[in-house]
Protein backbone atom coordinates (compact mmCIF):
# COMPACT_ATOMS: atom_id res chain seq x y z
CA UNK A 1 0.00 0.00 0.00
CA UNK A 2 1.23 3.48 -0.84
CA UNK A 3 0.95 6.74 1.07
CA UNK A 4 1.47 10.42 0.44
CA UNK A 5 4.25 11.76 2.65
CA UNK A 6 5.98 15.05 3.29
CA UNK A 7 9.69 14.30 3.00
CA UNK A 8 12.90 16.11 3.88
CA UNK A 9 15.22 14.52 1.26
CA UNK A 10 18.18 16.63 2.39
CA UNK A 11 18.74 19.75 4.51
CA UNK A 12 16.45 22.66 3.59
CA UNK A 13 14.54 20.71 0.92
CA UNK A 14 10.89 19.66 1.17
CA UNK A 15 8.96 17.35 -1.16
CA UNK A 16 5.62 15.53 -1.28
CA UNK A 17 6.33 11.93 -2.26
CA UNK A 18 4.52 8.66 -2.73
CA UNK A 19 6.05 6.08 -0.38
CA UNK A 20 5.43 2.36 0.09
CA UNK A 21 4.14 1.51 3.54
CA UNK A 22 5.24 -1.45 5.67
CA UNK A 23 2.79 -4.35 5.84
CA UNK A 24 0.14 -4.23 8.54
CA UNK A 25 1.25 -6.35 11.51
CA UNK A 26 -0.65 -7.91 14.39
CA UNK A 27 -0.75 -4.82 16.61
CA UNK A 28 -0.79 -2.20 13.85
CA UNK A 29 -3.61 0.10 12.86
CA UNK A 30 -3.99 1.97 9.58
CA UNK A 31 -4.84 5.64 10.08
CA UNK A 32 -6.09 8.06 7.43
CA UNK A 33 -5.00 11.50 8.54
CA UNK A 34 -7.36 14.41 9.07
CA UNK A 35 -4.73 16.92 10.15
CA UNK A 36 -1.16 17.21 11.33
CA UNK A 37 0.60 20.17 12.90
CA UNK A 38 4.15 21.41 12.47
CA UNK A 39 6.33 21.61 15.56
CA UNK A 40 8.12 24.83 14.66
CA UNK A 41 11.24 24.23 16.73
CA UNK A 42 11.77 20.49 16.33
CA UNK A 43 10.99 20.41 12.62
CA UNK A 44 13.04 23.52 11.88
CA UNK A 45 16.10 21.94 13.49
CA UNK A 46 15.40 18.68 11.66
CA UNK A 47 15.02 20.40 8.29
CA UNK A 48 18.28 22.29 8.74
CA UNK A 49 20.15 19.16 9.83
CA UNK A 50 20.81 20.47 13.33
CA UNK A 51 19.10 17.86 15.48
CA UNK A 52 21.40 16.53 18.23
CA UNK A 53 23.19 13.18 18.28
CA UNK A 54 22.11 12.26 14.76
CA UNK A 55 18.55 11.42 15.85
CA UNK A 56 17.27 12.56 12.44
CA UNK A 57 18.99 11.61 9.19
CA UNK A 58 18.03 12.19 5.56
CA UNK A 59 15.80 11.39 3.81
CA UNK A 60 13.18 11.50 6.55
CA UNK A 61 9.45 11.98 7.08
CA UNK A 62 8.92 14.62 9.77
CA UNK A 63 6.00 15.28 12.09
CA UNK A 64 4.78 14.00 15.45
CA UNK A 65 1.46 15.85 15.90
CA UNK A 66 -1.02 13.81 13.85
CA UNK A 67 -4.73 13.08 14.11
CA UNK A 68 -6.75 10.73 11.95
CA UNK A 69 -9.31 7.95 11.62
CA UNK A 70 -8.63 4.23 12.01
CA UNK A 71 -9.55 2.41 8.79
CA UNK A 72 -7.98 -1.02 9.40
CA UNK A 73 -6.69 -3.06 12.33
CA UNK A 74 -4.25 -5.93 12.69
CA UNK A 75 -5.51 -9.16 14.26
CA UNK A 76 -4.70 -8.15 17.85
CA UNK A 77 -5.13 -4.39 17.48
CA UNK A 78 -8.83 -4.98 16.81
CA UNK A 79 -9.29 -5.84 20.49
CA UNK A 80 -8.54 -2.20 21.39
CA UNK A 81 -9.30 -0.13 18.29
CA UNK A 82 -12.23 -0.09 15.89
CA UNK A 83 -12.54 1.28 12.40
CA UNK A 84 -13.86 4.81 12.74
CA UNK A 85 -11.96 5.58 15.96
CA UNK A 86 -10.21 8.94 15.81
CA UNK A 87 -6.71 8.85 17.27
CA UNK A 88 -3.86 11.18 18.10
CA UNK A 89 -0.48 9.48 17.65
CA UNK A 90 3.20 10.33 18.05
CA UNK A 91 4.76 8.48 15.12
CA UNK A 92 4.01 5.97 12.39
CA UNK A 93 5.99 2.95 11.28
CA UNK A 94 8.77 4.24 9.03
CA UNK A 95 8.74 3.22 5.35
CA UNK A 96 11.88 1.50 4.08
CA UNK A 97 14.56 3.99 3.12
CA UNK A 98 13.37 6.72 5.48
CA UNK A 99 14.90 5.51 8.74
CA UNK A 100 17.12 7.23 11.25
CA UNK A 101 14.15 9.19 12.51
CA UNK A 102 11.80 9.02 15.50
CA UNK A 103 8.99 11.08 13.93
CA UNK A 104 7.14 10.08 10.71
CA UNK A 105 3.79 11.79 11.24
CA UNK A 106 3.13 13.81 8.07
CA UNK A 107 1.79 11.01 5.86
CA UNK A 108 -1.49 9.35 4.96
CA UNK A 109 -2.43 6.64 5.35
CA UNK A 110 -0.10 5.81 8.24
CA UNK A 111 0.70 2.43 9.78
CA UNK A 112 0.82 2.95 13.55
CA UNK A 113 1.87 0.42 16.19
CA UNK A 114 -0.84 0.19 18.84
CA UNK A 115 0.73 -2.58 20.96
CA UNK A 116 -0.05 -1.67 24.60
CA UNK A 117 3.15 -3.38 25.76
CA UNK A 118 5.16 -0.87 23.72
CA UNK A 119 3.08 2.27 24.11
CA UNK A 120 4.27 4.69 26.82
CA UNK A 121 7.32 2.48 27.31
CA UNK A 122 9.77 5.40 27.59
CA UNK A 123 8.72 8.43 29.64
CA UNK A 124 5.13 8.14 28.37
CA UNK A 125 6.06 7.71 24.70
CA UNK A 126 5.17 6.55 22.09
CA UNK A 127 1.40 6.84 22.34
CA UNK A 128 -1.88 6.38 20.52
CA UNK A 129 -4.68 8.30 22.23
CA UNK A 130 -8.34 8.35 21.23
CA UNK A 131 -9.69 11.80 20.38
CA UNK A 132 -12.77 12.93 22.34
CA UNK A 133 -15.96 12.98 20.29
CA UNK A 134 -16.60 16.43 18.88
CA UNK A 135 -13.06 17.78 19.22
CA UNK A 136 -11.84 19.26 15.92
CA UNK A 137 -8.86 17.49 14.39
CA UNK A 138 -6.78 20.62 13.89
CA UNK A 139 -7.10 21.58 17.54
CA UNK A 140 -6.45 18.00 18.69
CA UNK A 141 -3.25 17.96 16.63
CA UNK A 142 -1.88 20.78 18.82
CA UNK A 143 -2.43 18.73 21.99
CA UNK A 144 1.09 17.30 21.75
CA UNK A 145 2.60 20.79 22.08
CA UNK A 146 0.39 21.55 25.07
CA UNK A 147 1.50 18.22 26.53
CA UNK A 148 5.13 19.36 26.23
CA UNK A 149 4.18 22.29 28.45
CA UNK A 150 2.40 19.91 30.84
CA UNK A 151 5.59 17.94 31.48
CA UNK A 152 7.49 21.01 32.63
CA UNK A 153 4.58 22.18 34.78
CA UNK A 154 4.19 18.74 36.37
CA UNK A 155 7.92 18.46 37.08
CA UNK A 156 7.94 21.93 38.66
CA UNK A 157 4.85 21.01 40.74
CA UNK A 158 3.22 24.37 40.02
CA UNK A 159 0.26 25.03 42.32
CA UNK A 160 -2.34 27.65 43.18
CA UNK A 161 -0.01 29.60 45.48
CA UNK A 162 2.55 30.26 42.74
CA UNK A 163 3.30 33.35 40.73
CA UNK A 164 4.69 32.16 37.42
CA UNK A 165 6.56 33.97 34.65
CA UNK A 166 6.48 32.40 31.17
CA UNK A 167 9.04 33.79 28.71
CA UNK A 168 8.10 33.18 25.08
CA UNK A 169 4.53 32.94 23.79
CA UNK A 170 4.75 30.48 20.95
CA UNK A 171 2.31 27.57 21.16
CA UNK A 172 4.19 25.79 23.98
CA UNK A 173 4.66 28.94 26.05
CA UNK A 174 1.07 30.05 25.49
CA UNK A 175 -0.24 26.61 26.46
CA UNK A 176 2.00 26.63 29.54
CA UNK A 177 0.44 29.89 30.67
CA UNK A 178 -3.11 28.59 30.21
CA UNK A 179 -2.34 25.35 32.04
CA UNK A 180 -0.66 27.16 34.95
CA UNK A 181 -3.83 29.21 35.37
CA UNK A 182 -5.90 26.02 35.28
CA UNK A 183 -3.86 24.99 38.33
CA UNK A 184 -4.77 28.26 40.03
CA UNK A 185 -1.43 30.02 39.62
CA UNK A 186 -1.15 33.67 38.63
CA UNK A 187 0.78 34.13 35.40
CA UNK A 188 2.81 36.88 33.74
CA UNK A 189 3.89 36.23 30.16
CA UNK A 190 6.51 37.97 28.03
CA UNK A 191 7.21 38.08 24.30
CA UNK A 192 8.62 40.54 21.78
CA UNK A 193 5.90 40.12 19.14
CA UNK A 194 2.78 42.29 19.59
CA UNK A 195 0.45 39.67 18.06
CA UNK A 196 1.61 37.00 20.50
CA UNK A 197 1.40 39.40 23.43
CA UNK A 198 -2.19 40.24 22.50
CA UNK A 199 -3.19 36.56 22.17
CA UNK A 200 -1.59 35.89 25.53
CA UNK A 201 -3.42 38.80 27.13
CA UNK A 202 -6.72 37.56 25.72
CA UNK A 203 -6.46 33.84 26.46
CA UNK A 204 -3.54 32.95 28.71
CA UNK A 205 -2.13 35.51 31.13
CA UNK A 206 -3.06 37.67 34.08
CA UNK A 207 -0.41 40.10 32.82
CA UNK A 208 1.09 40.06 29.30
CA UNK A 209 4.24 42.11 28.65
CA UNK A 210 5.92 43.18 25.42
CA UNK A 211 9.52 42.97 26.59
CA UNK A 212 10.75 45.22 23.76
CA UNK A 213 8.50 48.06 24.84
CA UNK A 214 8.31 47.61 28.62
CA UNK A 215 10.69 47.08 31.52
CA UNK A 216 10.23 43.34 32.03
CA UNK A 217 12.16 43.20 35.31
CA UNK A 218 10.10 46.08 36.66
CA UNK A 219 6.79 44.50 35.61
CA UNK A 220 7.81 41.20 37.24
CA UNK A 221 8.77 42.99 40.46
CA UNK A 222 5.36 44.67 40.46
CA UNK A 223 3.57 41.40 39.64
CA UNK A 224 5.32 39.51 42.47
CA UNK A 225 5.17 42.42 44.95
CA UNK A 226 8.94 42.53 45.03
CA UNK A 227 9.42 38.89 46.06
CA UNK A 228 10.41 37.43 42.70
CA UNK A 229 8.72 34.65 40.77
CA UNK A 230 8.10 31.24 42.30
CA UNK A 231 8.66 29.70 38.87
CA UNK A 232 10.07 31.00 35.59
CA UNK A 233 9.32 28.88 32.51
CA UNK A 234 11.69 29.59 29.64
CA UNK A 235 10.53 28.65 26.14
CA UNK A 236 12.94 30.98 24.34
CA UNK A 237 15.77 28.46 23.98
CA UNK A 238 18.25 31.27 24.66
CA UNK A 239 20.85 30.91 27.40
CA UNK A 240 21.35 34.68 27.19
CA UNK A 241 17.70 35.03 28.19
CA UNK A 242 18.15 32.39 30.89
CA UNK A 243 20.77 34.61 32.56
CA UNK A 244 18.19 37.37 32.86
CA UNK A 245 15.51 34.98 34.06
CA UNK A 246 17.62 33.83 37.00
CA UNK A 247 17.31 37.37 38.35
CA UNK A 248 13.51 37.19 38.10
CA UNK A 249 13.36 34.30 40.59
CA UNK A 250 12.71 34.54 44.28
CA UNK A 251 15.10 32.72 46.61
CA UNK A 252 14.59 28.96 46.23
CA UNK A 253 12.60 29.56 43.04
CA UNK A 254 12.39 27.13 40.12
CA UNK A 255 13.62 27.70 36.57
CA UNK A 256 12.09 25.43 33.92
CA UNK A 257 14.25 24.92 30.82
CA UNK A 258 11.32 24.30 28.46
CA UNK A 259 13.09 25.33 25.24
CA UNK A 260 15.73 23.52 23.21
CA UNK A 261 19.28 24.65 23.85
CA UNK A 262 21.67 23.51 21.10
CA UNK A 263 25.35 23.72 21.95
CA UNK A 264 27.53 25.60 22.58
CA UNK A 265 25.98 27.14 25.70
CA UNK A 266 27.38 29.42 28.36
CA UNK A 267 25.51 29.76 31.63
CA UNK A 268 26.66 31.43 34.85
CA UNK A 269 25.68 28.75 37.33
CA UNK A 270 26.99 30.83 40.23
CA UNK A 271 24.06 33.23 39.78
CA UNK A 272 21.71 30.28 40.17
CA UNK A 273 23.57 29.21 43.31
CA UNK A 274 23.13 32.66 44.81
CA UNK A 275 19.37 32.27 44.27
CA UNK A 276 19.38 28.72 45.72
CA UNK A 277 17.49 27.98 42.52
CA UNK A 278 16.09 24.64 41.40
CA UNK A 279 16.54 23.82 37.71
CA UNK A 280 13.93 21.69 35.93
CA UNK A 281 14.83 20.01 32.62
CA UNK A 282 11.73 18.53 30.93
CA UNK A 283 11.96 16.79 27.59
CA UNK A 284 9.26 15.53 25.27
CA UNK A 285 5.73 14.72 26.39
CA UNK A 286 3.50 11.78 27.27
CA UNK A 287 0.36 10.08 26.06
CA UNK A 288 -1.27 10.76 29.41
CA UNK A 289 -0.65 14.49 29.02
CA UNK A 290 -1.95 14.45 25.42
CA UNK A 291 -5.17 12.80 26.63
CA UNK A 292 -5.44 15.31 29.47
CA UNK A 293 -4.98 18.27 27.12
CA UNK A 294 -7.54 16.96 24.62
CA UNK A 295 -10.01 16.56 27.47
CA UNK A 296 -9.42 20.16 28.57
CA UNK A 297 -9.89 21.31 24.97
CA UNK A 298 -13.16 19.42 24.70
CA UNK A 299 -14.34 21.02 27.96
CA UNK A 300 -13.37 24.50 26.78
CA UNK A 301 -10.73 24.90 29.49
CA UNK A 302 -7.75 24.96 27.12
CA UNK A 303 -8.12 27.06 23.96
CA UNK A 304 -5.51 26.60 21.24
CA UNK A 305 -7.68 27.12 18.15
CA UNK A 306 -6.96 30.89 18.18
CA UNK A 307 -3.24 30.12 17.85
CA UNK A 308 -3.63 28.58 14.37
CA UNK A 309 -2.17 31.11 11.94
CA UNK A 310 -1.77 29.04 8.77
CA UNK A 311 -3.49 26.10 7.09
CA UNK A 312 -1.94 24.27 4.13
CA UNK A 313 -2.63 21.31 1.88
CA UNK A 314 0.20 18.74 1.80
CA UNK A 315 0.99 19.87 -1.75
CA UNK A 316 1.93 23.24 -0.24
CA UNK A 317 4.45 21.76 2.19
CA UNK A 318 7.42 23.60 0.68
CA UNK A 319 5.58 26.89 1.18
CA UNK A 320 4.76 25.98 4.78
CA UNK A 321 8.34 25.16 5.68
CA UNK A 322 9.59 28.30 3.94
CA UNK A 323 7.59 30.17 6.57
CA UNK A 324 9.16 28.04 9.30
CA UNK A 325 12.71 28.75 8.09
CA UNK A 326 12.48 32.31 6.87
CA UNK A 327 9.48 34.01 8.48
CA UNK A 328 8.91 32.28 11.83
CA UNK A 329 7.79 35.56 13.39
CA UNK A 330 4.62 35.37 11.25
CA UNK A 331 3.59 31.94 12.50
CA UNK A 332 2.29 30.05 15.50
CA UNK A 333 0.12 27.04 14.74
CA UNK A 334 0.64 25.61 11.23
CA UNK A 335 -1.77 22.87 10.16
CA UNK A 336 -1.77 20.47 7.21
CA UNK A 337 -5.26 19.44 6.06
CA UNK A 338 -4.93 15.89 4.71
CA UNK A 339 -8.62 15.34 4.02
CA UNK A 340 -8.28 17.66 1.03
CA UNK A 341 -5.27 15.71 -0.29
Regions of interest found by a model, annotated:
Residues 281-283, 295-319:
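Glycine- and charged-residue-rich phosphate/anionic-cofactor binding loop of Rossmann-like
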Residues 239-299, 338-341:
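Glycine-rich phosphate-binding loop and adjacent beta-alpha segment
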Residues 133-213, 218, 233:
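Mid-domain Rossmann-like dinucleotide-binding core that forms the NAD(H)/NADP(H) cofactor-binding site
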Residues 91-167:
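NAD(P)H dinucleotide-binding glycine-rich loop of Rossmann-like/cofactor-binding domains
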Amino acid sequence: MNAKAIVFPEPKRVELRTVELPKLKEWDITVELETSAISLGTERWALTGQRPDGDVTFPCIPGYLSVGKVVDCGASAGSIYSCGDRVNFLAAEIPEGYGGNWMCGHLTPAIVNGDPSKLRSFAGMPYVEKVPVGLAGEEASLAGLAAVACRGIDMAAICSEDRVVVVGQGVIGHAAAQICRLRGARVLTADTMPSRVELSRRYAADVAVNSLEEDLAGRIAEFTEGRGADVVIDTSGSTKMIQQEVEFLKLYGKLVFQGWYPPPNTLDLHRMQLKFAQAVFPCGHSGDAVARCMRWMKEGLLRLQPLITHRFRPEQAAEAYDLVLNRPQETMGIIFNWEAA
